[in-house]
Amino acid sequence: MANYTSAPEDDYDVFIEDDLSNDERELCSPYDPQALLAQLVPYLFITVFLVGLLDNILVVLIMVKYKGLKQVENIYLLNLAVCNLCFLCTLPFWVHMAWHEGDPGEPLCKILLVLYSVGLFSEAFFNVLLTVQRYQKFFQMRGFFSATRMVAGSIFPSALVWVIAVLVMLPELAFYKPQMENQKYKCFFGRPLFLPADETFWKHFLTLKMNILGFLLPLFVFVFCYVRMRRTLKFGERGYDLFKLVFTIMVVFLLMWGPYNIALFLSAFNEHFSLHGCESSHNLDRSTLITKIIATTHCCVNPLLYVFFDEAFRKHLYHFCHLCNDTAPQPTEEPAQGTSREEPCLSTKM
């Protein structure tokens, strides 16, 4: 009889402890990002969308029409612009949901998830490809290939990056569940897109995946290649300007996405850092939201970097705007393939 009563009592005690811990957690109300989203997101994201759409389309046009796709770097930069356009497509929907708190439905939430994740991871991977390609070119690891073969060889890595970005996104899509609020399904910008994050394993797994593939991998490749190249590359040497552009693109990417990755990591592993109190939890949620908003503006920054650090791009942009304003344009003045050889002559005008 004693053995029969002791086991249920032990189980009952464990059940009560779990209930108490859950009650304690429920006392801490979840952070409500709606006020911050309604104030900050609409105007900021509308500006980012309009500026990003304009300058990334200009990048695509200039890369295809003027600079051409005979250089591997141009192909990767063109793909970066496409990544940014994928990312930009999600912004109007976040603005609408922040303003009107509408119910977009589960299919649209999944489409936003796909565009957001694929755009983010593909941009990180193309930054890695750009850095590695510069590293290879400096040390002449592919110097015996012809230009045509080099460009043909860049098509496979570009396609592979898009395939990998889609595969990396699949866990989020497979485990995605829209959240319920006021009896409506909603997809939130302010919270990580990998819900059901109630399962601790998947929350940790998907957070580490984001940290490693979206931040630490580009950071490691950048530091390794930069240190090796910096020892041999001299100021004014041929290729220095392109090195400076690739370097700046990667640094800006890491600076804008680094704070979000740190905040996301601390939020997911808060119990290991004694940050599970109500105030700490709210501060982490707010920090994750703010850093995510800042990082999202990155999709309109790259083309501005081209204007400041790529002299050839700046000249082609000048001629493109000149042709648009000219009532009688002369297409023979700027042949599509006369880019690299004409740059020294054009540079004297700037």
Swiss-Prot record:
Give the disulfide map: C109-C187
**Cytoplasmic side stretches:** 65-74, 132-149, 226-244, 310-350
Question: Where is carbohydrate linked to this protein?
Answer: N3
Biological process (GO) annotations?
calcium-mediated signaling; cell chemotaxis; immune response; inflammatory response; positive regulation of cytosolic calcium ion concentration
Database matches in Gene3D superfamilies: Rhodopsin 7-helix transmembrane proteins
| Membrane topology listed for this record | Multi-pass membrane protein
For this UniProt record, the keywords arranged alphabetically read as follows: Cell membrane, Disulfide bond, G-protein coupled receptor, Glycoprotein, Membrane, Receptor, Transducer, Transmembrane, Transmembrane helix
What the entry lists under CDD domains is as follows:
7tmA_CCRL2
Q: Which family does it belong to?
A: Belongs to the G-protein coupled receptor 1 family.
Query: What does this gene product do?
Result: Receptor for CCL19 and chemerin/RARRES2. Does not appear to be a signaling receptor, but may have a role in modulating chemokine-triggered immune responses by capturing and internalizing CCL19 or by presenting RARRES2 ligand to CMKLR1, a functional signaling receptor. Plays a critical role for the development of Th2 responses.
Q: What is this protein called?
A: Chemokine C-C motif receptor-like 2
This chain's source organism reads: Sus scrofa
**What gene, per UniProt, encodes this protein?**
CCRL2
